């Protein structure tokens, strides 16, 4: 119930990953982002920055949950998304489909030894940006599946950003 309105609908089938990858140039890949507000914000940022699709790995919250839809300003209903197959330590195998479709897989990390994000993105045609849960970030399984580990430069004394904020910055770059 929202402002006196109730709606019920059947979920449309998710698009096939292969179909998404045929035309996409930029995709977001989310691992363990379990907060519905962060999911909604990431979809809103992705839509605003021209990301073509969002791929959901293990532990990602349901983008069609009421709070996610609301925070996204409805963009979860417009932006294609698909769940990657597999469990907590096996979903990363689905990333091979992105590599096979000529995507460069970039993982966001606060690690000071990672490449500067702008440098990592320079000259790339097709990008899959992986972001992980707030706090733990991406698992080592996910990090190993990527081509480049990239960081967002931050002021001294700041060690991390909210996952939706970090995603927005990476989509803008």
What are these regions (language model features)?
Residues 9-22, 117-123:
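Glycine-/acidic-rich phosphate or pyrophosphate-binding loops and their flanking alpha/beta elements
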Residues 2, 71-75, 123-126:
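Short, hinge-like loop/turn segments at secondary-structure boundaries
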Residues 1-8:
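A contiguous, low-structure linker/loop signature
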Residues 106-158:
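Active-site/ligand-binding-proximal alpha/beta "capping" segment
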Residues 14-113:
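RNA substrate-binding interface of SAM-dependent RNA methyltransferases
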Residues 7, 45-49, 60-80, 140-173:
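Structured adenosyl-cofactor binding patch, chiefly the S-adenosyl-L-methionine
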């Amino acid at each position: 119930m929202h402002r006196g309105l109730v709606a019920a609908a059947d979920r449309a089938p998710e698009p096939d990953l292969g179909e998404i990858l045929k035309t996409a140039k930029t995709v977001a890949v989310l691992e363990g982002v379990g907060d519905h507000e962060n999911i909604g914000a990431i979809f809103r940022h992705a839509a605003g920055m021209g990301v073509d699709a969002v791929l959901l790995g293990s532990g990602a919250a349901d983008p069609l949950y009421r709070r996610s839809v609301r925070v996204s300003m409805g963009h979860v209903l417009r932006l294609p998304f698909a769940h990657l197959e597999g469990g907590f330590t096996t979903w990363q195998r689905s990333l091979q489909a992105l590599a096979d479709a000529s995507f460069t897989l970039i993982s966001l990390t606060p690690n000071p030894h990672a490449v500067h994000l702008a440098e990592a993105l320079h000259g790339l045609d097709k990008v899959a940006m992986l972001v992980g849960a707030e706090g733990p970030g991406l698992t080592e399984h996910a990090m190993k599946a990527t081509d480049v580990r990239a960081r967002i430069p931050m002021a001294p004394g700041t060690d991390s950003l909210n996952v939706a904020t970090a995603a927005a910055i990476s989509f803008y770059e």
